[in-house]
Regions:
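Exposed, flexible binding/inhibitory loops of compact, secreted disulfide-stabilized domains
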Residues: 1-104
């Protein structure tokens, strides 16, 4: 079944790819203008899980943006795994630079 990217809310999910690959997807849902972004920062393999670190960015108040409804998303392709895929939203720029001791 097809995935509906035009959702009005944020979501995270995994899609099957070709052969031995999968796609990790993070979406922001429907936004009223351009300038909203999604960035998958790191995909970290841990002993029992794959952790996906991502962040959202909103346009600055004075930023010139596209005046159109947008559906920001990001995706990465990784090798298929039986490990659980976990998602961690990074709220602050330096949060992921302190090392990869991620608390989930």
């Amino acid at each position: 079944s097809a995935v509906e990217f035009k959702s009005r809310k944020e979501s995270t999910f995994v899609l099957p790819g070709e052969d031995d690959e999968i796609y990790i997807v993070v979406t922001r849902g429907e936004k009223p203008t351009g300038g909203f972004t999604v960035d998958i920062l790191h995909v970290i393999e841990q002993e029992d899980a794959i952790v996906t670190l991502y962040k959202f960015k909103d346009p600055a108040d004075d930023e010139l943006v596209t005046q159109a409804i947008t559906y920001p998303f990001d995706l990465v392709k990784i090798d298929k795994t039986d490990k659980t895929i976990k998602f961690k939203k990074i709220e602050h720029e330096n949060e992921h630079e302190e090392g990869f001791n991620i608390q989930l």
